[in-house]
Amino acid sequence: MTNSTPIRSTHFDAIVIGSGPGGEGAAMGLTKANLNVAIIEREPSVGGGCTHWGTIPSKALRHAVSRIIEFNSNPLYCKNNTSLHSTFSDILGHAKSVIDKQTRMRQGFYDRNQCSLIFGEASFVEKNTVAVTAKDGSIETYTADKFIIATGSRPYRPEGINFNHSRVYDSDSILSLKHDPRHIIIYGAGVIGSEYASIFRGLGVKVDLVNTRDRLLSFLDNEMSDALSYHFWNSGIVTRNDENFEHIEANDDGVIMHLESGKKMKADCILFANGRTGNTDKLNLSAVGLEADSRGQLKVNDNYQTDVEHIYAVGDVIGYPSLASAAYDQGRFTAQAITKGKAEARLIDHIPTGIYTIPEISSVGKTEQELTAAKVPYEVGRSSFKHLARAQIAGKDIGSLKILFHRETKEILGIHCFGERAAEIIHIGQAIMEQKGEANTIEYFVNTTFNYPTMAEAYRVAALNGLNRLF
């Protein structure tokens, strides 16, 4: 057992299980309200899956690959027919350095706020008691008045696949890839699968992307999904839609995937990225009268309370939206519920989505298909990045911004962006969308002055384009 500050007692006002974004948000909120708080983390360092296997490393890898692509496509550098080549193992070092920085920073949060850190696997013993099993096998028990379960999720591993084989990976173990594949199969074309397809293809690896649905990222606006499909095709990624695996053969020299349709695919290795499950199986929930669903998730009310009054849950372990940003907010709201009797805030209605493929995608609000189904009289304003001076200067002219707005009230209903820095660009429009009443209007972008040249100017161009469609 290791702790950031000396543990004053084995009893705490609150114990948070898990130090990912949800656990961190809850712990910080509770300690700032002067509660005696402990946080239990099963891994050797804080940060949770987001920091060590999920959001941070995958985005760091994506950034490194993007810079390689930029170097190789820039006429300033490639005029001598020289190009920069890196392997997956080469760029893992960049991800590791970012993870280390994030871990040190988050460790500092707990140190400054005198939050006790306990390292080990937590499981409930009875209503107000948890046992923590350390790496050396020793067991300590702790009691608390309140508990917050923030244990996150892990990749779904179906039976019949040998994930211990050196050629078979999930989205956690892929960060321990020991060889440099020339050809990879990625099963699952959701956000994680699509992001890794971009990363590997950017490194020159042949990618077969197997999608269990009829289109890529079907929750997106159709134009965004179509744009991603085109760019994947244009980059050389082979996408197989509407396919399900039957079984996987893993050999010393590669893998063969057999599909239910009768097709067979062969590659050096496979990344299985189809679904996630909540980390609740080792918590011994039955000891406190709780039961997770088939996906390992817990039900909570508006205050993030489970069916057991003094036990709360946040983050991936409660399902949608399963975003690091939302989990942190849920943790803060839970701290409010515990200290003030009620969560004073809740997640916003329109949570932005950021997908770090190459190119990037981000959206907030309604899609065209949703507005059409609801018979909302909307209009569309578009801006192509290739017409923006800043994009031309930066050589980032692939992409577009689309604003959906009500024809009569001019209220912004949805914003969809495809291209470099899309996840940053989206927040400009989101800020206006969140305004109340008449303040949410597409006319804002026409009546304000933007810096020039900027990518933000896409909003002015799209707004003018959309307003010119009205009659």
Swiss-Prot record:
Q: Could you name the domain of life of the organism this protein comes from?
A: Bacteria
Localization recorded for this chain is:
Cytoplasm
Q: Which top EC class is named for this enzyme in its record?
A: oxidoreductase
Q: What is its EC number?
A: 1.6.1.1
Q: Which cofactor does it need?
A: FAD
Question: In its UniProt record, which GO terms are filed under biological process?
Answer: 2-oxoglutarate metabolic process; NADP metabolic process
Reactions catalysed: NAD(+) + NADPH = NADH + NADP(+)
- Kindly state what the record says about how the cofactor is bound: Binds 1 FAD per subunit.
| One Pfam family from the record | Pyr_redox_2
Where is FAD bound in this sequence?
Answer: E41, R42, E43, P44, S45, V46, G47, G48, G49, C50
Gene Ontology cellular component annotations, sorted alphabetically? cytosol
Record GO terms (molecular function):
dihydrolipoyl dehydrogenase (NADH) activity; flavin adenine dinucleotide binding; NAD(P)+ transhydrogenase (Si-specific) activity
Keyword annotations of the record: Cytoplasm, FAD, Flavoprotein, NAD, NADP, Oxidoreductase
Asked whether the keyword Oxidoreductase is assigned, the reply is yes
Q: Where the protein is mainly located, per its record?
A: cytoplasm
Q: Member of which family?
A: Belongs to the class-I pyridine nucleotide-disulfide oxidoreductase family.
Role description: Conversion of NADPH, generated by peripheral catabolic pathways, to NADH, which can enter the respiratory chain for energy generation.
Q: What is this protein called?
A: Soluble pyridine nucleotide transhydrogenase
User: Which organism does this record belong to?
Assistant: Aliivibrio fischeri (strain ATCC 700601 / ES114) (Vibrio fischeri)
